[in-house]
Amino acid sequence: MPSKSSSPQSNSTRKNSCGCCCFSVRKFGFLAVFVAIFAALYSYLDARLEQFYIFNPEHLHDLSQRAIQAHGNDTRAMVDFIVAELDQKIPGNHLNKNEEWIFNNAGGAMGAMYIIHASITEYLIIFGTAIGTEGHTGRHTADDYFNILQGTQVAFVPGTFEPEVYPPGTVHHLRRGEVKQYKMEQSCFALEYARGWIPPMLFFGYADTFTSTLDFPTLWATTRVTGREMITNLLRRKF
């Protein structure tokens, strides 16, 4: 009669199979716990974002309007006016007063930016171009406020037949999760303020480098200044 005992090789195979299965279940369990903790932490912090903000959209809009009234079409003077007042009103040395202009390619649009502030929950920049640009706004994890200082910005959403028009002194509020086509006609500069979760927005800012421009020196400059400001602000307890 044939033997009913299993061979050592088949026993070993069953043990290895059982071990792999148990290991996979443990990994899945750890992953599920991690995702649950992350989701709970995100929900907790997201509901309390207001306590981390140091800028106010209404004040920035008022400041932009006063800069325009004081300096007309002199954008250089408007930038100085804005930074000087913010330096007086925002405590804690959270501003970058070294005016470092960097090209920015994102969503097909190209311009230049000066990063005044960057942290985990906010950024404030001067963004614009002297020759015009057009592109995709991106779909972001933060509210974005474009305070137009010079020139005109227009925007379009599907289903409408007329553009949204934003002349100097107005604010274009791109709400969190919304998306538009936008254009800065000819020379146009804005004080741009974002509040919400800033790090996920960096993927949008980096994508054009890898898919189009291959301008890695500019990518490095953006990373260096943004990272420096975010880390510096974290060390100063600005989340």
Swiss-Prot record:
Membrane topology, as annotated: Single-pass membrane protein
GO molecular function: isomerase activity
Top-level class of the enzyme under EC nomenclature: isomerase
Domain of life assignment: Eukaryota
Catalytic activity: fecosterol = episterol
UniProt pathway annotation: Steroid metabolism; ergosterol biosynthesis
Keywords: Endoplasmic reticulum, Glycoprotein, Isomerase, Lipid biosynthesis, Lipid metabolism, Membrane, Steroid biosynthesis, Steroid metabolism, Sterol biosynthesis, Sterol metabolism, Transmembrane, Transmembrane helix
Subcellular localization: Endoplasmic reticulum membrane
GO biological process: ergosterol biosynthetic process
Sites carrying sugar chains: 11, 73
GO cellular component, one term: endoplasmic reticulum membrane
Residue ranges of the TM segments: 27-47
EC number: 5.-.-.-
Family in the record: Belongs to the ERG2 family.
Function field: The third module or late pathway involves the ergosterol synthesis itself through consecutive reactions that mainly occur in the endoplasmic reticulum (ER) membrane. Firstly, the squalene synthase erg9 catalyzes the condensation of 2 farnesyl pyrophosphate moieties to form squalene, which is the precursor of all steroids.
Other observations noted: In Aspergillus, the biosynthesis pathway of the sterol precursors leading to the prevalent sterol ergosterol differs from yeast. The ring system of lanosterol in S.cerevisiae is firstly demethylised in three enzymatic steps leading to the intermediate zymosterol and secondly a methyl group is added to zymosterol by the sterol 24-C-methyltransferase to form fecosterol. In Aspergillus, lanosterol is firstly transmethylated by the sterol 24-C-methyltransferase leading to the intermediate eburicol and secondly demethylated in three steps to form fecosterol.
Listed name of the protein: C-8 sterol isomerase erg2
